Amino acid sequence: MKYIWQLANFPKFKYDTSKLLALVEESVILIGEIRGIMKGFSPVLQDEVSAQVMLSEAIKTSEIEGAYFSREDVMSSLMMNLGLIDYVLPSKNKNADAIAQLMIEVRKNYNQPLTLEMILHWHELLMRHHTDIQGGALRSSSEPMQVISGRYGDIQVHYEAPPSKDLTLLLENFFEWYKTFEDSTLGKIGEAIILSALSHLYFETLHPFEDGNGRIGRAITEKVLAEKLQSPLFISLSACIEKSKSTYYDEIKKAQRSLEVTDWLVYSIEVLIQGLKETVLVVQFVRKKTEFYDRYNNELNERQRKAINKMFNQGISGFEGGMTAKKYVSINKTTKSTATRDLQELVDKNIFVRMGGGRSTSYELNLV
């Protein structure tokens, strides 16, 4: 079976809009809900939501490719590059800095047309600390670019991309298709959603880089949505994709074998809906965090504030296992008796809720 780039009528994708209508309508409602809430937020709170979403996207788009970074490394780089803090100690992980800078760059230029120069710049940012990959350059090897799995002697080829010698023309065709794409069947937002999903598939099919295609492809998805909707979209698609990576790869593999892409669009819009729902949770979390500090900040000592900041920094996923006396001692470099006294005070003030008892005692923030 041929891959779609080998078909004479590529990239004339076909899909059944009747199977997308309900999903697009749900997406439109969620986008409207998020926009409405964000309009009521101050610029500071909007930046907080943006940072939380970019943090999730940076970490999860990397984890999909097998790269793991600490939340602290990525968050500190994001906050400094966004100008939300003046200075942080340099990150020990330069690749964490790189993915953070990519996230900011993608969103900063959301209203500019997608171009080859833009994508090459993203790739240069992403790969600038890799000595084995030339950042900002298309692949040039005469060897086939294949997506494979298995061990030596038992290799399975999942996909073979176009030869590198054809990439210049193929990318010209991609950007021309992108600029001229029209489908008003499902409205303006529906058109943006469809174009973003197809752009992701199209780019992944060309696979123009030696490495980083997945991360750039997912960045393109969010860039296209924001550009066509004419406003930044606060969403992390990779956080939803990462929950079931095998499904993601299976859907791409299937879509690269037929120009009938209804299933790919259904999958992509379902991921979008999940991402939008996650954003609603992030917005609610940021609001509760703000209300919490407005109410309790003056009642906290420095140790308590440091521990609570640590808990909030874990985002909507929460502080795994809750706060414990042992963790409190470690965070503050203090004694167990001081930790016990501080924690009890937080319970007495209804700031913490005690969970369990004895050695298994832990504490959760009371955000009700």
In which residue ranges do the predicted regions lie?
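FIC/Doc superfamily catalytic core
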Residues: 1-368
